[in-house]
Amino acid sequence: VHHLAGELFKITFQLDMVHVPYKGVGAVIPDLIGGHIPMTFSSMPPSMPYVKTGRLRALAVTSTRRSWAAPDVPTMIAAGVPGFVATNWFAYFVPAGTPGTIVGKLNAEINRTLKLEDVKATLVELGLDTLGTTPEELGKFVREESEKFEKLIKLAGVKGAY
């Protein structure tokens, strides 16, 4: 998502900037702090310790709402970039064909756990916002995200190799 957020930024502002395809945030953060690159899109967990100590400055979050971990940081939309949403998300998946009773029980337990105050506090400290959903809502979200990023990948001319 980080690379695609950068491509969306380039396209949105019609910028002529070089995309440096780092393989992970482990090398990006030191290069950003060291002034070797001017900016990056990063997930919250690896960045927040540096934001909290003043070594990095968070300009905006790319979600639709402010982060619980950084409530003073505006969304890209609030910062004046309409429609700019590119979130890094985590979900639980099971094999296709898993019985609905098992899916329902797992979903209920995951949602119950996400509501526990100590779990919420730990996740917020890491820079993660929680949102429990139903399997149907997750399926719809995954389809929408896939369609959105497929369009962006084509528009940006992104090529990949494995």
Per-segment meaning from a language model:
Residues 1-162:
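Conserved, function-defining micro-sites of small-solute handling proteins
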